[in-house]
Amino acid sequence: MSELVKISKTQFENVFQCEFNDGTVRLCTKNLAPGFSVYGERLFKVEGVEYREWNAFRSKLGGAILKGLKQNPIVKGTKVLYLGAASGTTPSHVSDIVELEGKVYGVEFSPRVVREFLLVAQHRPNLFPILADARFPQYYRTLVEDVDVLYVDIAQPDETDIAIYNAKFFLKNGGYMMMAIKARSIDVTKEPTEIYEMEVNKLKENNFDVIQVIQLDPYDKDHAMVLAKYKGK
């Protein structure tokens, strides 16, 4: 197995680069819950600090960073609403990035998956699992404060509409949305690039300035990450 030889900072706060003796380079984050691995990722201790390897093939945010994300609005102290938290793989890295000064509210619809997410959250005081349907934000509005970033990863045909609706409830004016679009969940008959353009236009029509659209191949086939800034309700 390859051994870690160097950890260095990236352009993004609290996102690091791990270099190994076989020449490979991976992303990593400081582990907010030392000793605990979330999805089988490797842990490394350097000068008393534990880091977690961040597998971009398991995380669309990790893939977007490696594919040239220009700006990561998720930093120390950020409050994030995460729709489609699943079992907590990417939310756990977001939890590392925002540290204890930030908060990550993770909405997931599947009770079975939420049980796994709860096991992750019990070691992370800044991670708040919510069992709910993201189509109905009014049911969790009392649980979530206004947030700086809305992160959306729900493989539904109406994902963009759900994202916009949640933004109206929770996203601060001037806040950011990061949305992972799965083209095949929206329309299997159209080319992915055509679908990305359609969904981006919906955002523009609903008070978002679209900053960047990143195709996530090879990390996620027929997926794109959209970064947009919210101009307000």
Swiss-Prot record:
GO terms for biological process: box C/D sno(s)RNA 3'-end processing; tRNA processing. Pfam families: Fibrillarin. Its EC number is 2.1.1.-. It comes from the Archaea. Belongs to the methyltransferase superfamily. Fibrillarin family. Gene3D superfamilies: Phosphorylase Kinase, domain 1 (3.30.200.20), Vaccinia Virus protein VP39 (3.40.50.150). It is an enzyme of class 2 (transferase). This is Fibrillarin-like rRNA/tRNA 2'-O-methyltransferase. Interacts with nop5. Component of box C/D small ribonucleoprotein (sRNP) particles that contain rpl7ae, FlpA and nop5, plus a guide RNA. The keyword Aminoacyl-tRNA synthetase does not apply. The keyword Cell cycle does not apply. GO terms for molecular function: histone H2AQ104 methyltransferase activity; RNA binding; rRNA methyltransferase activity. Involved in pre-rRNA and tRNA processing. Utilizes the methyl donor S-adenosyl-L-methionine to catalyze the site-specific 2'-hydroxyl methylation of ribose moieties in rRNA and tRNA. Site specificity is provided by a guide RNA that base pairs with the substrate. Methylation occurs at a characteristic distance from the sequence involved in base pairing with the guide RNA. SMART domains: Fibrillarin. InterPro entries: Fibrillarin, Fibrillarin_CS, SAM-dependent_MTases_sf.
